[in-house]
A protein has these predicted regions:
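N-terminal leader/linker segments that precede catalytic domains of diphosphate-processing enzymes
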Residues: 1-54, 58-117, 134, 147-200
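Short, charged, solvent-exposed linker or helix-capping segments at domain edges/interfaces
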Residues: 24, 119-123, 140
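Acidic, glycine-rich loop-and-strand cores that form catalytic or ligand-binding grooves
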Residues: 118-135
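A mid-sequence, solvent-exposed acidic-amphipathic segment
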Residues: 135-144
Length: 200
């Protein structure tokens, strides 16, 4: 893990959609995965206020590992217990590229839920979205986010999720996650194995 910043963890949570919303599948075709996103609540002085994100947060002294950080934060933010799912492993650690953002190192964990319990968002979460992975991999999801600061424009790659754009560090995590799926599958259902770090 890179050094020089505080540590944090997020959970990229996948599920097979419930039968009521899953597209029809043949006898040998599994329904495609959906990926969970949250829209963070508007909080003054929070650099990620109102952003689209994965559930997660900063590592606390009582957390035995970053996997436990992801578990605790997801439970606090959404009432979702990741121990009810299967941890595939961790993606590469990431840090913000902007010098204006806090120095923090984020480890993303990939979890597949074997059921779809209802989400109970806390005050930190304004909205939740389950987005089909197949759509995220299609051209219709590709977008550009424009940031205007001091009379200048910066253009960032982004993904459309509902009426919102996923950009910044979450976009970088998502791009890394999507590379795990077999590019030849028309409906991505089987991500490749990841380095495993067990949940507590």
């Amino acid at each position: 893990m890179p050094h020089g910043g505080r540590l944090a963890a997020v959970a990229a949570v996948l599920r097979v959609p419930p039968v009521s919303v899953a597209p029809p599948a043949g006898p040998s075709v599994a329904p495609p995965f959906e990926l969970l996103f949250i829209k963070r609540a508007e909080v003054p002085h929070d650099p990620w206020s109102g952003h689209m994100a994965f559930p997660g947060g900063r590592h606390e002294p009582g957390d035995a590992s970053l996997a436990e950080t992801a578990l605790r934060e997801t439970r606090e933010e959404l009432g979702l217990d990741l121990r009810d799912g299967t941890l595939l492993g961790a993606l590469d650690d990431l840090a913000p590229v902007s010098a204006h953002l806090p120095r923090i190192v984020v480890r993303p964990f990939v979890v597949v839920m074997t059921s779809s319990p209802p989400l109970v968002p806390s005050h930190e979460v304004a909205a939740t979205f389950w987005e089909p992975v197949a759509r995220l991999r299609s051209s219709v999801a590709q977008a550009t986010h424009i940031v205007r600061l001091g009379g200048r424009e910066a253009h960032y790659p982004a993904y459309r999720v509902g009426p919102h754009l996923v950009w910044g560090m979450t976009e970088r995590i998502l791009r890394q996650l999507l590379t795990l799926f077999d590019p030849h599958e028309t409906a991505p259902t089987t991500p490749v194995p990841l380095p495993v770090e067990s949940l507590p």
